[in-house]
Amino acid sequence: MSGWLSGPRDSRPLGHSAIDGGGDPFSGARVVSVAHFEPAAGMQGEALDSYKRRFGTLFVDESTRRRGGIGSVVRATNVLGEQFALKTLAIPERDERASEAECERYEAGLKTAFRQEFECHKAVSGLKGFPHLYGMGEVAGMPAIVMEWVCGETLVHVCDALAVDGAGRMPTLVAAQIGRDVFDLLAHLDFLEGGFVHRDISLANVMVCTSRLSLAEQVEEGFFDVCLIDFGSSTPEEMQGSSFTR
């Protein structure tokens, strides 16, 4: 499964959704506006204007919202019916014991970290096994990142689904095959100029994508379409010390 991902796996219209098999993607959705949109890839002129319009208005499905790190992710659909993941910075309620200046510094730090997550994600967008990144803007005044919506399950759920005993152990061969494919994914990071460190590789941050083949079909084939998600802790390798987790 080595190679490069030339584009997003699945931004098809939701009328035939890989998530729910169909239905009205706009039913019960909340409308949000994405302001000050900045594309992940450089463009200008009419192409830039057209690209911004593609993400200007999104319909979010709150039932899909998941919290992780300093943000929350929700599935969003644009007016063309394309689906994306919308990650918005989540700033906690202010501590009444903290001063106004302390709260402002804390919020500024979160925004800086969120921006760094976007920049790190840009470095791997386009690599096989990483979600495609579209851009960054603001939703209701909060920084927001628009990226590929990955259809699949995290390794947490995969382990449960494939467990052969009450302890949650997977078949040894399947575990080795998944480990091989995760290693293959990480090996591509060596091609990046300056390097890249994820720093939070866990069962919750590795997904098995099922938009092409079901989990059962991938088990049968012995190869897994794995994807690394959540770049909130990532950083360029040159910023690391002598100890880190890729």
Region spans (language model):
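Activation-segment/catalytic-loop signature of the eukaryotic protein kinase fold
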Residues: 136
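Juxta-kinase regulatory segment immediately upstream of eukaryotic protein kinase catalytic domains
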Residues: 3-56
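Activation segment signature within eukaryotic-like protein kinase domains
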Residues: 178-179
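Activation segment/activation loop of eukaryotic-type protein kinase catalytic domains
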Residues: 204-246
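Protein kinase glycine-rich loop
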Residues: 62-68, 73
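AlphaC helix of the eukaryotic protein kinase fold
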Residues: 102-123
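Catalytic-loop of the protein kinase fold
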Residues: 190-210
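Conserved short submotifs of the Hanks-type protein kinase catalytic core
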Residues: 140-154
